[in-house]
Amino acid sequence: MIISEKKQIKMLSNAEMELIHLGACRLLSRVGVKVTHEVIAEKLISQGALRKGERITIPANMVENALEKTAKTIQFDAPDPAYSFTLNAVENRVKFGPGGQALYIVHPAAGGWGRRPAGTDDLKQILVLCNRLKNVDFITRPVECDVPEDRMDLEKARIFRQCCSKPMNLANLIKVEHLDRVLEMIGDPAHVSFIISLISSPLVLDNSAGDKFIALVEKNLPVSISCCPQGGSTAPFSEVGELLQLHAELLFGFVLGNVIRPGARLLYRGIPVTSNLYTDGSPRWCQPESIRRVALAAQLCRFYNLPCCGTAGVSDEAEPSAQVISEKVLSWVYEMAAGAQYINSALGMLEQVLSVSYQQYVIDDILLGIVKEKFGENGSLKPSQLALSAATAALSRFGVAVDEKMEAELAARIRHIENAMEPYNEEYIGEQLNLIEKAVNKTSSTVFMKTARKGLREGYLYRGDRIDAPLDLSDATGRLESILGQVN
């Protein structure tokens, strides 16, 4: 669907985004990226990068050249041509697909929910299910096959070829030497795309990912460059600092991609989440401050007319619940309103990225239909009003009587998403640049955690109440049984 200009949100001004961009370019030219992959280092140096010990620094002109050259339109073809679509960086068209690399399946058990390891049969069943869900536009690998690692790529390709008629995102490539065989098994390379986590935060090139990135870009395959720093552990706890680091890490990928192949077909996938510094440091994927930061990354990407791979709907809850519905709906609304186009991991995800649920895929498909209806309605609702309306409608759809207390909690989450807590100015950006430089030269997690105390005191991490109410899942269960029953 197309998101109208009226339904978009601009949480950063153009001037603020320009400051973040200039700061990220300073970070690349001053601190650079640790690169021990000699082939990649030489490729970058040949185009104007500089060596600084083990780090490669990137001058601003290389960044600007990459942004100018990189493909602005990417075609995603499908085995069934009816599902093919084009992503154009200047359009506000949004598509949704599942994703993740979940280890577990959450399933009904003894009046509640159980959890078991995911495997090959689950990959088949989930692909079949997503192939039939109305609001799934493309399918990203949700779980891995339970086969030896040296067979994973080929088994995954075989199952996708057998079960998927929509555009396929195979996500990661386990063995780069399998790429030619994978493409042969798929049948048409135009049907597939990939995701690469190229940089380990803060600012270190992953050598294995670098090999795979070269192979994929040389074949002109679409690649989402994914970066998921955690504010407070692998990036500054500051929103401004985390965006600076994230943007620099992703820009490095665009520079490298266009050195390998000018006009490379790359998507910007920024997932700047926070760490739960109140407990175990785990990522807070779908809490208000993370929803805000991920939406800001999408807005920053679209400001530079780059194809945007978004991430939304990755609930922190372990099983289907009213809280899950609330987290997912707010996450989708703000990622859509901020300009994300190719929204990955949007369905089925629970317990951060550890689990998926067959029931949750169907629930999410229904919920996405509600959210799309809200975006499609006439009128001039602000994103905050649209988000509240969508969340209450979604909860009501599954039998939750939304009361004043629930509405107040939803409104508080929305305010936390929309309200900035830090200045976007040159002085503050300079402080964050110095912090990142200090972190890359020392133990980064220690540096970032020590400086997180101020943000904790000021409430960067949202601490509200869970939305707790029983759900009526009879319709979702019936739909699931109908779909899987028809194909089994």
Predicted regions and their residues:
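A glycine-rich phosphate-binding loop feature that marks nucleotide/adenosyl-phosphate handling sites
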Residues: I40-S46, G270-N276, A312-P320, L350-L354, ...
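Short beta-alpha connecting loops at secondary-structure transitions
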Residues: E5-I9, T279-W285, G313-P320, G348-Q360
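Helix-rich catalytic cores of soluble enzyme domains
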Residues: G114-A337, Q341
